[in-house]
Protein backbone atom coordinates (compact mmCIF):
# COMPACT_ATOMS: atom_id res chain seq x y z
CA UNK A 1 0.00 0.00 0.00
CA UNK A 2 2.79 2.41 0.95
CA UNK A 3 4.63 1.55 -2.26
CA UNK A 4 1.55 2.27 -4.36
CA UNK A 5 1.10 5.59 -2.58
CA UNK A 6 4.71 6.55 -3.30
CA UNK A 7 4.23 5.73 -7.00
CA UNK A 8 1.05 7.81 -7.11
CA UNK A 9 2.77 10.76 -5.45
CA UNK A 10 5.71 10.49 -7.87
CA UNK A 11 3.41 10.43 -10.90
CA UNK A 12 1.47 13.39 -9.52
CA UNK A 13 4.69 15.34 -9.04
CA UNK A 14 5.80 14.53 -12.60
CA UNK A 15 2.40 15.67 -13.86
CA UNK A 16 2.69 18.97 -12.01
CA UNK A 17 6.23 19.44 -13.34
CA UNK A 18 4.99 18.75 -16.87
CA UNK A 19 2.25 21.30 -16.49
CA UNK A 20 4.79 23.77 -15.21
CA UNK A 21 7.11 23.20 -18.15
CA UNK A 22 4.23 23.59 -20.59
CA UNK A 23 3.12 26.76 -18.85
CA UNK A 24 6.63 28.19 -18.99
CA UNK A 25 6.87 27.35 -22.70
CA UNK A 26 3.57 29.03 -23.42
CA UNK A 27 4.58 32.00 -21.28
CA UNK A 28 7.81 32.37 -23.23
CA UNK A 29 5.87 32.08 -26.48
CA UNK A 30 3.75 35.00 -25.33
CA UNK A 31 6.90 37.12 -25.03
CA UNK A 32 6.86 36.89 -21.26
CA UNK A 33 3.69 38.97 -21.11
CA UNK A 34 1.43 37.48 -18.42
CA UNK A 35 -1.66 39.26 -19.73
CA UNK A 36 -1.05 38.02 -23.27
CA UNK A 37 -0.38 34.56 -21.87
CA UNK A 38 -3.73 34.43 -20.09
CA UNK A 39 -5.57 35.89 -23.07
CA UNK A 40 -4.01 33.40 -25.45
CA UNK A 41 -4.97 30.47 -23.24
CA UNK A 42 -8.54 31.71 -22.99
CA UNK A 43 -8.66 32.03 -26.78
CA UNK A 44 -7.22 28.52 -27.09
CA UNK A 45 -10.03 27.15 -24.95
CA UNK A 46 -12.57 29.04 -27.06
CA UNK A 47 -11.13 27.71 -30.33
CA UNK A 48 -11.34 24.15 -29.06
CA UNK A 49 -15.12 24.48 -29.09
CA UNK A 50 -15.11 25.99 -32.60
CA UNK A 51 -12.93 23.44 -34.35
CA UNK A 52 -15.69 22.64 -36.83
CA UNK A 53 -15.75 26.28 -37.95
CA UNK A 54 -11.99 26.25 -38.44
CA UNK A 55 -12.17 23.11 -40.54
CA UNK A 56 -15.12 24.16 -42.70
CA UNK A 57 -14.33 26.25 -45.82
CA UNK A 58 -16.63 29.09 -46.76
CA UNK A 59 -17.64 27.58 -50.11
CA UNK A 60 -16.96 25.18 -52.97
CA UNK A 61 -15.71 27.61 -55.62
CA UNK A 62 -12.06 26.75 -56.28
CA UNK A 63 -11.48 29.70 -58.63
CA UNK A 64 -8.26 31.40 -57.44
CA UNK A 65 -8.55 34.97 -56.20
CA UNK A 66 -5.68 37.43 -55.94
CA UNK A 67 -5.15 38.46 -52.32
CA UNK A 68 -2.53 41.02 -51.36
CA UNK A 69 -0.89 41.70 -47.99
CA UNK A 70 0.82 45.06 -47.91
CA UNK A 71 3.88 45.72 -45.79
CA UNK A 72 2.74 46.72 -42.30
CA UNK A 73 -0.76 45.22 -42.53
CA UNK A 74 -1.97 44.02 -39.12
CA UNK A 75 -3.62 40.63 -38.60
CA UNK A 76 -6.92 42.45 -38.17
CA UNK A 77 -6.50 44.27 -41.47
CA UNK A 78 -5.68 41.01 -43.24
CA UNK A 79 -8.63 39.23 -41.64
CA UNK A 80 -11.04 41.99 -42.64
CA UNK A 81 -9.77 41.91 -46.23
CA UNK A 82 -10.26 38.13 -46.35
CA UNK A 83 -13.79 38.57 -45.05
CA UNK A 84 -14.62 41.25 -47.63
CA UNK A 85 -13.33 38.99 -50.43
CA UNK A 86 -15.64 36.25 -49.15
CA UNK A 87 -12.75 33.94 -48.33
CA UNK A 88 -13.58 33.50 -44.62
CA UNK A 89 -16.80 33.77 -42.59
CA UNK A 90 -15.41 35.25 -39.40
CA UNK A 91 -12.56 37.77 -39.26
CA UNK A 92 -12.25 37.53 -35.47
CA UNK A 93 -11.94 33.76 -35.62
CA UNK A 94 -9.12 34.11 -38.14
CA UNK A 95 -7.25 36.57 -35.91
CA UNK A 96 -7.73 34.30 -32.89
CA UNK A 97 -6.35 31.34 -34.82
CA UNK A 98 -3.30 33.32 -35.89
CA UNK A 99 -2.63 34.32 -32.31
CA UNK A 100 -2.99 30.88 -30.78
CA UNK A 101 -0.76 29.35 -33.47
CA UNK A 102 1.84 32.11 -33.07
CA UNK A 103 1.32 33.21 -36.68
CA UNK A 104 0.12 36.74 -36.00
CA UNK A 105 3.67 38.07 -36.36
CA UNK A 106 4.60 35.78 -39.28
CA UNK A 107 2.36 37.11 -42.08
CA UNK A 108 4.46 38.00 -45.15
CA UNK A 109 3.71 40.84 -47.52
CA UNK A 110 2.96 39.69 -51.05
CA UNK A 111 0.22 38.68 -53.46
CA UNK A 112 -1.27 35.23 -52.97
CA UNK A 113 -3.90 33.14 -54.69
CA UNK A 114 -6.65 31.82 -52.46
CA UNK A 115 -10.02 30.20 -53.04
CA UNK A 116 -13.20 29.40 -51.14
CA UNK A 117 -12.36 25.73 -50.63
CA UNK A 118 -9.54 26.61 -48.22
CA UNK A 119 -10.09 26.46 -44.47
CA UNK A 120 -8.87 29.10 -42.03
CA UNK A 121 -5.77 27.01 -41.15
CA UNK A 122 -5.07 26.49 -44.87
CA UNK A 123 -5.23 30.22 -45.54
CA UNK A 124 -3.22 31.14 -42.45
CA UNK A 125 -0.31 28.87 -43.34
CA UNK A 126 -0.41 30.01 -46.98
CA UNK A 127 -0.01 33.64 -45.92
CA UNK A 128 3.15 33.08 -43.88
CA UNK A 129 5.23 31.86 -46.82
CA UNK A 130 5.74 34.19 -49.78
CA UNK A 131 6.89 31.18 -51.81
CA UNK A 132 3.18 30.42 -52.16
CA UNK A 133 2.88 33.65 -54.11
CA UNK A 134 3.27 32.76 -57.80
CA UNK A 135 1.42 32.32 -61.10
CA UNK A 136 1.74 29.13 -63.13
CA UNK A 137 1.28 29.93 -66.82
CA UNK A 138 1.72 27.73 -69.86
CA UNK A 139 2.21 28.72 -73.48
CA UNK A 140 1.48 25.87 -75.85
CA UNK A 141 3.47 24.97 -78.94
CA UNK A 142 1.84 26.37 -82.05
CA UNK A 143 -0.10 29.14 -80.28
CA UNK A 144 -0.41 32.53 -81.94
CA UNK A 145 -0.21 35.74 -79.92
CA UNK A 146 -4.00 36.13 -79.77
CA UNK A 147 -4.27 32.69 -78.17
CA UNK A 148 -1.62 33.63 -75.62
CA UNK A 149 -3.66 36.74 -74.80
CA UNK A 150 -6.77 34.59 -74.38
CA UNK A 151 -4.82 32.29 -72.04
CA UNK A 152 -3.86 35.30 -69.91
CA UNK A 153 -7.54 36.17 -69.46
CA UNK A 154 -8.49 32.53 -68.83
CA UNK A 155 -5.76 32.23 -66.19
CA UNK A 156 -7.38 35.04 -64.22
CA UNK A 157 -4.40 35.67 -61.96
CA UNK A 158 -2.51 38.35 -63.84
CA UNK A 159 -2.75 42.02 -62.93
CA UNK A 160 -3.29 42.92 -66.59
CA UNK A 161 -5.61 41.78 -69.35
CA UNK A 162 -4.92 39.81 -72.48
CA UNK A 163 -5.68 42.92 -74.51
CA UNK A 164 -3.05 44.87 -72.60
CA UNK A 165 -0.54 42.14 -73.39
CA UNK A 166 -1.61 42.24 -77.05
CA UNK A 167 -0.65 45.92 -77.19
CA UNK A 168 2.83 44.99 -75.95
CA UNK A 169 3.06 42.07 -78.40
CA UNK A 170 1.96 44.17 -81.36
CA UNK A 171 4.48 46.86 -80.48
CA UNK A 172 7.09 44.21 -81.14
CA UNK A 173 10.76 45.02 -80.82
CA UNK A 174 10.66 48.81 -81.08
CA UNK A 175 12.38 49.19 -77.70
CA UNK A 176 14.46 46.02 -78.10
CA UNK A 177 16.80 46.88 -81.01
CA UNK A 178 19.65 44.62 -79.85
CA UNK A 179 17.35 41.59 -79.62
CA UNK A 180 15.95 42.31 -83.08
CA UNK A 181 19.40 42.78 -84.59
CA UNK A 182 20.76 39.55 -83.11
CA UNK A 183 18.04 37.46 -84.72
CA UNK A 184 17.51 39.44 -87.91
CA UNK A 185 14.01 40.56 -86.94
CA UNK A 186 12.56 43.44 -88.98
CA UNK A 187 11.46 46.50 -87.04
CA UNK A 188 7.88 46.02 -88.25
CA UNK A 189 7.56 42.56 -86.66
CA UNK A 190 5.32 41.73 -83.71
CA UNK A 191 6.29 39.24 -81.00
CA UNK A 192 4.67 36.45 -83.02
CA UNK A 193 6.87 33.36 -82.91
CA UNK A 194 8.99 34.55 -80.00
CA UNK A 195 6.62 33.83 -77.09
CA UNK A 196 8.55 30.70 -76.20
CA UNK A 197 6.29 27.71 -75.41
CA UNK A 198 6.96 26.60 -71.86
CA UNK A 199 5.36 26.35 -68.41
CA UNK A 200 6.35 29.43 -66.43
CA UNK A 201 6.30 30.14 -62.69
CA UNK A 202 5.82 33.90 -62.48
CA UNK A 203 5.69 36.50 -59.70
CA UNK A 204 2.15 37.79 -59.15
CA UNK A 205 3.23 41.41 -59.59
CA UNK A 206 4.56 40.76 -63.10
CA UNK A 207 3.52 43.32 -65.73
CA UNK A 208 2.68 42.80 -69.38
CA UNK A 209 6.13 44.10 -70.30
CA UNK A 210 7.71 41.90 -67.64
CA UNK A 211 5.99 38.85 -69.11
CA UNK A 212 7.28 39.79 -72.55
CA UNK A 213 10.82 40.06 -71.22
CA UNK A 214 10.58 36.68 -69.48
CA UNK A 215 9.34 34.93 -72.63
CA UNK A 216 11.97 36.53 -74.85
CA UNK A 217 14.73 35.69 -72.37
CA UNK A 218 13.63 32.05 -72.38
CA UNK A 219 13.65 32.08 -76.18
CA UNK A 220 17.20 33.45 -76.21
CA UNK A 221 18.39 30.82 -73.76
CA UNK A 222 16.96 28.11 -76.02
CA UNK A 223 18.31 29.26 -79.40
CA UNK A 224 21.53 31.14 -78.63
CA UNK A 225 24.92 29.52 -79.00
CA UNK A 226 25.43 26.68 -81.45
CA UNK A 227 21.92 26.75 -82.91
CA UNK A 228 22.14 30.44 -83.78
CA UNK A 229 25.66 30.02 -85.15
CA UNK A 230 24.64 27.03 -87.30
CA UNK A 231 21.63 28.88 -88.69
CA UNK A 232 23.73 31.91 -89.60
CA UNK A 233 26.40 29.67 -91.15
CA UNK A 234 23.74 28.34 -93.53
CA UNK A 235 22.84 31.88 -94.56
CA UNK A 236 19.64 31.95 -92.54
CA UNK A 237 18.69 34.51 -89.91
CA UNK A 238 17.03 33.17 -86.80
CA UNK A 239 13.92 35.12 -87.81
CA UNK A 240 13.74 33.10 -91.03
CA UNK A 241 14.31 29.89 -89.08
CA UNK A 242 11.53 30.73 -86.61
CA UNK A 243 9.21 31.70 -89.46
CA UNK A 244 9.58 28.34 -91.19
CA UNK A 245 9.62 26.48 -87.86
CA UNK A 246 6.24 27.99 -86.97
CA UNK A 247 4.79 26.44 -90.13
CA UNK A 248 6.42 23.09 -89.36
CA UNK A 249 5.00 23.29 -85.83
CA UNK A 250 1.48 23.69 -87.16
CA UNK A 251 1.90 20.88 -89.72
CA UNK A 252 3.60 18.23 -87.59
CA UNK A 253 1.80 16.14 -85.00
CA UNK A 254 4.85 14.12 -83.97
CA UNK A 255 8.19 15.77 -83.21
CA UNK A 256 10.07 13.03 -85.04
CA UNK A 257 8.62 14.30 -88.31
CA UNK A 258 9.74 17.90 -87.79
CA UNK A 259 13.08 17.58 -89.65
CA UNK A 260 11.41 15.67 -92.51
CA UNK A 261 8.62 18.23 -92.99
CA UNK A 262 11.25 20.97 -92.72
CA UNK A 263 13.23 19.27 -95.49
CA UNK A 264 10.18 19.37 -97.78
CA UNK A 265 9.80 23.11 -97.32
CA UNK A 266 13.50 23.80 -97.65
CA UNK A 267 13.60 21.72 -100.83
CA UNK A 268 10.72 23.77 -102.25
CA UNK A 269 12.44 27.04 -101.37
CA UNK A 270 15.66 25.92 -103.06
CA UNK A 271 13.93 25.43 -106.42
CA UNK A 272 11.70 28.50 -106.14
CA UNK A 273 8.50 26.53 -105.58
CA UNK A 274 5.80 28.08 -103.40
CA UNK A 275 5.55 26.60 -99.90
CA UNK A 276 1.81 25.85 -100.29
CA UNK A 277 1.42 25.55 -96.51
CA UNK A 278 -2.15 25.29 -95.23
CA UNK A 279 -1.37 26.88 -91.82
CA UNK A 280 -0.39 30.11 -93.58
CA UNK A 281 -3.84 30.29 -95.14
CA UNK A 282 -5.41 29.68 -91.73
CA UNK A 283 -3.28 32.46 -90.29
CA UNK A 284 -4.42 34.83 -93.00
CA UNK A 285 -8.07 34.13 -92.16
CA UNK A 286 -7.54 35.40 -88.61
CA UNK A 287 -10.60 34.57 -86.47
CA UNK A 288 -13.12 35.20 -89.24
CA UNK A 289 -14.67 31.73 -88.84
CA UNK A 290 -14.89 31.61 -85.07
CA UNK A 291 -11.55 29.91 -84.49
CA UNK A 292 -7.94 30.86 -85.00
CA UNK A 293 -7.16 27.68 -86.96
CA UNK A 294 -10.23 26.93 -89.12
CA UNK A 295 -10.70 24.19 -91.64
CA UNK A 296 -9.96 25.52 -95.12
CA UNK A 297 -11.20 24.73 -98.60
CA UNK A 298 -9.56 24.48 -102.00
CA UNK A 299 -11.05 27.87 -102.84
CA UNK A 300 -9.29 29.43 -99.85
CA UNK A 301 -5.91 28.68 -101.38
CA UNK A 302 -6.49 31.36 -104.01
CA UNK A 303 -9.13 33.54 -102.41
CA UNK A 304 -7.51 34.38 -99.06
CA UNK A 305 -5.74 37.62 -99.88
CA UNK A 306 -3.00 37.82 -97.28
CA UNK A 307 0.77 38.27 -97.49
CA UNK A 308 0.95 35.15 -95.31
CA UNK A 309 -0.83 32.93 -97.85
CA UNK A 310 2.02 30.86 -99.29
CA UNK A 311 -0.17 29.51 -102.10
CA UNK A 312 -0.23 32.90 -103.80
CA UNK A 313 3.02 34.38 -102.46
CA UNK A 314 6.47 32.94 -103.06
CA UNK A 315 9.17 32.43 -100.45
CA UNK A 316 8.68 32.67 -96.72
CA UNK A 317 5.74 34.60 -95.26
CA UNK A 318 6.54 38.01 -93.67
CA UNK A 319 7.10 36.40 -90.28
CA UNK A 320 6.17 33.54 -87.96
CA UNK A 321 2.56 32.44 -87.66
CA UNK A 322 2.82 30.88 -84.18
CA UNK A 323 5.24 29.96 -81.39
CA UNK A 324 7.35 26.99 -82.53
CA UNK A 325 8.84 24.46 -80.15
CA UNK A 326 12.59 23.97 -79.91
CA UNK A 327 12.06 20.66 -81.73
CA UNK A 328 10.54 22.49 -84.72
CA UNK A 329 13.32 25.10 -84.68
CA UNK A 330 15.97 22.38 -84.65
CA UNK A 331 14.11 20.57 -87.42
CA UNK A 332 14.55 23.60 -89.67
CA UNK A 333 18.19 24.20 -88.72
CA UNK A 334 19.06 20.51 -89.05
CA UNK A 335 16.60 19.06 -91.58
CA UNK A 336 16.76 15.48 -92.74
CA UNK A 337 18.39 15.22 -96.16
CA UNK A 338 15.63 14.10 -98.51
CA UNK A 339 14.41 14.55 -102.06
CA UNK A 340 10.82 14.97 -100.88
CA UNK A 341 8.68 17.83 -102.16
CA UNK A 342 5.26 16.71 -100.96
CA UNK A 343 3.63 15.20 -97.91
CA UNK A 344 0.12 14.05 -97.10
CA UNK A 345 -1.46 13.07 -93.78
CA UNK A 346 -1.95 9.33 -93.55
CA UNK A 347 -5.56 8.23 -93.84
CA UNK A 348 -5.55 6.22 -90.59
CA UNK A 349 -5.70 9.32 -88.39
CA UNK A 350 -2.36 8.54 -86.75
CA UNK A 351 -1.00 12.04 -87.32
CA UNK A 352 1.88 10.70 -89.38
CA UNK A 353 2.49 11.69 -93.01
CA UNK A 354 3.43 10.02 -96.28
CA UNK A 355 6.26 11.80 -98.11
CA UNK A 356 6.80 11.75 -101.86
CA UNK A 357 9.06 13.17 -104.56
CA UNK A 358 6.51 13.99 -107.24
CA UNK A 359 3.06 15.52 -107.36
CA UNK A 360 1.72 12.42 -109.10
CA UNK A 361 2.91 10.26 -106.20
CA UNK A 362 1.40 12.79 -103.82
CA UNK A 363 -2.02 12.46 -105.43
CA UNK A 364 -1.91 8.69 -104.97
CA UNK A 365 -1.76 9.24 -101.20
CA UNK A 366 -5.07 11.11 -101.11
CA UNK A 367 -7.67 9.63 -98.79
Locations of regions flagged by a protein language model:
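N-terminal hydrophobic or amphipathic segments with adjacent small-residue motifs
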Residues: 12-17, 66, 136, 345
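N-terminal type II signal-anchor transmembrane helix
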Residues: 2-54
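Signal peptide-directed extracytoplasmic domains
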Residues: 32-222
Amino acid sequence: MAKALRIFVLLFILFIIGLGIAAVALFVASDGNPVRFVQTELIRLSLASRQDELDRPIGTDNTPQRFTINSGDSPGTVAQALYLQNLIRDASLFVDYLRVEGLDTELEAGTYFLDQTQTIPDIAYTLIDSRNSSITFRIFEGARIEEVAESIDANGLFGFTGQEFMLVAQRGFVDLPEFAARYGIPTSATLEGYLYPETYILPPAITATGLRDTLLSTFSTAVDGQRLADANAQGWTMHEIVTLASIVEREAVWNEENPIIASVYRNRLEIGQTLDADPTVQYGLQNSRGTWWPNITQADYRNVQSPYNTYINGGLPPGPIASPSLSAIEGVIYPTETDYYYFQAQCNGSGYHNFTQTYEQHLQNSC
